[in-house]
Swiss-Prot record:
InterPro entries reported for this sequence: Alkb, AlkB-like, AlkB-like_sf, Oxoglu/Fe-dep_dioxygenase_dom
Keywords from the named record: Cytoplasm, Dioxygenase, DNA damage, DNA repair, Iron, Metal-binding, Nucleus, Oxidoreductase
Residues that hold substrate according to the record: 179, 186-188
Consequence of gene loss (knockout): Elevated DNA N(6)-methyladenine (6 mA) methylation levels. Plants lacking ALKBH1A and ALKBH1D show delayed seed germination associated with dysregulation of seed germination key regulators (e.g. FUS3, TPC1 and SPHK1) due to a high 6 mA DNA methylation state.
Residues annotated as binding Fe cation: 243, 245, 299
EC number: 1.14.11.51
Protein name as it appears in the record: DNA N(6)-methyladenine demethylase ALKBH1A
Family of the protein in this entry: Belongs to the alkB family.
GO biological processes: DNA repair; regulation of seed germination
Catalytic reaction equation(s): an N(6)-methyl-2'-deoxyadenosine in DNA + 2-oxoglutarate + O2 = a 2'-deoxyadenosine in DNA + formaldehyde + succinate + CO2
Ranges of residues in domain Fe2OG dioxygenase: 225-345
One CC-aspect GO term: nucleus
Compartments in which it is found: Nucleus; Cytoplasm
Length: 345
């Protein structure tokens, strides 16, 4: 799911791949420092669509850029792109309170078994990862024969590892958390939904939120059924390569995508990677819908912004710190979370 640095030269020939390389995070040495401090390489962001700014201008004077139209005007306008039918962008769709709620759920509840994460393949189901990271615990291979792992306090590590068992800190595992799945579980090895796997239903509050935002993209007379969700976790330098979300049965139903945390660049391509993609900012609280023809469009995340001057999460950090202490705020300072809710059947 996450992009490898090893990409063939042939891939550079597509418009989508060129855009990925244009916006990806690269470092360059700062000549001002003798120890050769590295800084993010400047990039040209002038061509990015900024729906936050577009929304402000529209609310002030009703003006829209060429190729952009408004599909719905309520308390929060919904924007569309003329040559990408089925794509909807809702800026600031989630309040700060809602953003804080779903950040906390994404870190505490969503990785809990029976939900699966990228860690399952190596460590099996992991309970209470976030709390264990807060408490500086270490995951130790407790049983070499059955590959069972257990969290220990740091003071107990020497005793726990006397049999040369492997260990890894909970804080490292939290930072390496890349995805979790809610509702019907997605099998990444088979690239399909496995209804035989144990699972819990998606939380009611998240279902209702998804239904509310999905309504504008639904066929007339139908209601969105949230049956599965994938939560993506991005850290510094992480990307999500160009891909299609094509494992659901009915592409007329939208994917509801909620952005939380650091600002990102989103690429929306066409049905071929040769089609030049639209590049746009995604900020915390934005919601994107992709339905119908838009489900056939390649899309990805080539960059997240984690610097204080570019992440655009000052208010979110303050709210998180006030509500829940510094640990959530410290995590989100260098992270982005994306919740994608889907109707599977």
């Amino acid at each position: 799911m996450y992009e490898s640095a090893n990409v063939s030269d042939d891939a550079d020939r597509t418009a989508f791949r060129r855009a990925e390389k244009k916006y990806k995070l690269y470092y360059e040495q700062d000549s001002k420092f003798s120890r050769k401090k590295k800084l993010p390489k400047p990039i040209d962001l002038s061509e990015l669509l900024d729906f936050n700014l577009i929304s402000q201008n529209f609310n002030n004077d009703g003006v829209l850029p060429d190729g952009i139209r408004v599909s719905k005007v309520d308390s929060s306008p919904v924007f569309c792109i003329d040559n990408r039918p089925g794509f909807y962008f809702i800026p600031d769709a989630l309040s700060l309170k809602e953003q804080c709620k779903w950040i906390k759920e994404s870190l505490t509840s969503f990785p809990q078994p029976p939900n699966r994460t990228n860690h399952n393949a190596i460590y099996g189901p992991i309970d209470d990862l976030f709390d264990s990271a807060k408490e500086n615990k270490v995951l130790v291979q407790d049983d070499l024969t059955n590959n069972k792992w257990k969290f220990y306090e740091e003071v107990d590590i020497e005793k726990a590892t006397r049999s040369s068992c492997k260990s890894v800190s909970a804080s490292v595992l939290l930072r390496k958390l890349r995805w979790s799945t809610l509702g019907l579980q997605f099998d990444w090895s088979k690239r399909n939904y496995d209804v035989s796997l144990p699972h819990n239903n998606i939380p009611d509050a998240l279902c209702q939120l998804a239904k509310t935002h999905a309504a504008i993209a639904m066929p007339d007379g139908e209601e969105f059924r949230p049956e599965g969700a994938i939560v993506n976790y991005f850290g510094i330098g992480d990307t999500l390569g160009g891909h299609l979300d094509d494992m659901e049965a009915d592409w007329s139903k939208p994917i509801v995508s909620m952005s939380l945390g650091c600002k990102a660049i989103f690429l929306l391509g066409g049905k071929s990677k040769d089609d030049p993609p639209h590049a746009m900012y995604l900020r915390s609280g934005d919601v994107v819908l992709m339905a119908g023809e838009a489900r056939e469009c390649f899309h990805g995340i080539p960059r997240i912004f984690t610097g204080e001057e570019n992440a655009d999460i000052g208010a979110l950090e303050s709210e998180l710190s006030h509500e829940s202490g510094h640990f959530f705020a410290e995590y989100i300072k260098t992270s982005r979370i994306n919740i994608n809710i889907r109707q599977v059947f």
